[in-house]
A protein has these predicted regions:
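Proteins that catalyze or organize thiol-disulfide redox chemistry
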Residues: 1-54, 61-108
Length: 108
């Protein structure tokens, strides 16, 4: 994980998304090219919005229970949570500008 993002696991997921901060969870896998393209933009956004937004990266191969629980069928899938509840789901790679637009209403 980068210095601004948090590694999520099946064991820590509920605690992480229950954070008082809005939380964007990136469901990804090591073998997924589009997932790797998201690393830079997600790390930059996590740094830019530190203290306003938490970004969690969850490897679906290492943590299949959470991916199954939330019905993640393709990756990358990103979900925005507030107080433990899913608020928005984004399937597929996005640019930094697109991601910033998607999270803007949660961090204002």
């Amino acid at each position: 994980m980068g210095q601004n993002t948090v590694k999520g696991t099946d064991a820590t997921f509920s605690e992480l998304v229950g954070s008082p901060l809005p939380t964007l969870v990136d469901f990804w896998a090591e073998w997924c090219g589009p997932c790797k393209m998201m690393d830079g933009p997600l790390e930059e956004i996590a740094g830019d919005l530190a203290g306003k937004l938490q970004i969690v990266k969850l490897n679906v191969d290492e943590n299949p229970a959470t991916a199954m629980q939330y019905g993640v069928m393709s990756i990358p899938t990103m979900m925005i949570f507030q107080a433990g509840q899913e608020q928005k789901r984004l399937v597929g790679a996005r640019s930094k500008a697109q991601l910033e637009s998607e999270v803007a209403s949660f961090v204002s």
